């Protein structure tokens, strides 16, 4: 994000001198520039952040422990602990829509558009997700209007659906993707079938959806095991 938030200005005291400044409106407070040591004059520093701007850091800095989830990052543990939590049983799909990813960023205003579009078809949002915590009305997906213009590296709309609802959700995402001023990727979480197949593959192939080879797998090493 460093290259995308730089702004060049003339020094008002020495007009022949051009200085580099950070566009505070575009900065998502990810702290990558600080950790990278990219400034040769060591001019970068972390200002004190107040609410609602502190939300940018909570959602963007992977080393910042989010106060709502008490884990680093902007999401939940989702399938990574499913063998113990049992959040994703057979017959259900967990879905996560990562607004602003990869590398573009998003404002909560766009996250709200996606959430509200899904709420119209009866989607309920994951209770422990940090974005859900910002909703003032979870039945409609409406987010606190005071934070809508805050920009973050990404924000995740997370929910659980029955398998048969996937085509309808994809229809909604096709529509709302043309209404937001950012990009997003979709994640689907499910138990692999007993024959080793993935239950949603055929649905996505029929729609010519790109499926990344990258993913997360839970191999069931936790204890005690949940009945899923």
Indicate where each model-derived feature is located:
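Short, conserved charged micro-motifs
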Residues: 105-110, 163-172
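C-terminal edge-of-domain segments
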Residues: 150-162
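Long, contiguous binding/interaction regions
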Residues: 21, 28, 56-91, 115-119, ...
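Short amphipathic alpha-helix segments
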Residues: 110-140
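Iron-sulfur cluster-binding cysteine motifs and their immediate structural context
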Residues: 1-52
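Short glycine-/aliphatic-rich beta-strand segments at the starts of folded cytosolic domains
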Residues: 92-101, 155
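Extended, surface-exposed interaction regions
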Residues: 58, 96-99, 111
């Amino acid at each position: 994000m460093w290259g995308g938030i730089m702004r060049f200005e003339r020094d008002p005291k020495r007009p022949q001198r051009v200085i580099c400044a950070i566009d505070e409106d575009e900065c998502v407070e990810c702290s990558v520039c600080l950790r990278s040591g990219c400034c040769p004059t060591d001019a970068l520093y972390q200002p004190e952040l107040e609410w609602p701007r502190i939300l940018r850091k909570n959602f963007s800095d992977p080393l910042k422990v989010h106060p709502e989830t008490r884990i680093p990052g902007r999401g939940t543990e989702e399938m990574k602990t499913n063998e113990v939590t049992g959040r994703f049983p057979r017959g259900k799909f967990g879905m996560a829509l990562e607004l602003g990813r990869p590398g573009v960023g998003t404002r909560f205003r766009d996250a709200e558009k996606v959430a509200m579009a899904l709420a119209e078809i009866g989607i309920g949002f994951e209770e422990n997700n940090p974005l859900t915590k910002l909703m003032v009305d979870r039945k409609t997906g409406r987010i606190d209007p005071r934070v809508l213009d805050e920009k973050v590296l990404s924000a995740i709309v997370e929910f659980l659906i029955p398998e048969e609802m996937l085509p309808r959700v994809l229809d909604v995402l096709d529509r709302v993707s043309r209404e937001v001023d950012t990009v997003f990727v979709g994640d689907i979480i499910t138990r692999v079938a007993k024959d080793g197949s993935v239950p949603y593959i055929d649905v996505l192939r029929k729609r010519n959806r790109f499926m990344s080879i990258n993913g997360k797998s839970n191999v069931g090493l936790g204890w005690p095991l949940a009945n899923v």
